[in-house]
Amino acid sequence: MAKIDKARFWTGVLYPENMRPDWEEVIGDVLQNPYVYCKHTLDKDAKSEHRKDHVHLIVAFPNTTTYKHALKVMDLLSAEGKQAINTCQAVVGIRSMYDYLIHDTDTCRKQGKELYPPENRITGNNFDIGAYEQVGIA
């Protein structure tokens, strides 16, 4: 499978226990780019046991950027001496990934994943899903 090395939108999973304690208050200033995230606190594994709490994050860069840069930007949310994220991936379809934040996709429904309410998506720095969808179509 080919890996996408440059993209405008990047997503990753971060673990709160490794994030700076004030991350929710300073995320906009730290990332300095439009973002949306959803905290996953109700997910269960295949044995119906609670999965470790985590945060799904999408960052929108003004232009295409590299995997390495996107990962470094998201890693700024890590607590000192800790690593909250170890990998990220390019977003191929922004609407699909935006819906995945709350598990509102066909695949998530088939897998029986917990559906989070739309208001659990937290946006900042002028994240505008409608504008990004239009850019993707143009």
Model region roles, listed by residue range:
Residues 1-11, 15-24, 75-138:
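Catalytic "initiation/cleavage/transfer" segments centered on a nucleophilic residue
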Residues 71-73:
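Intrinsically disordered, low-complexity regulatory segments enriched in Ser/Thr/Pro
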Residues 1-53, 60-69:
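Signature for HUH/AEP ssDNA processing cores
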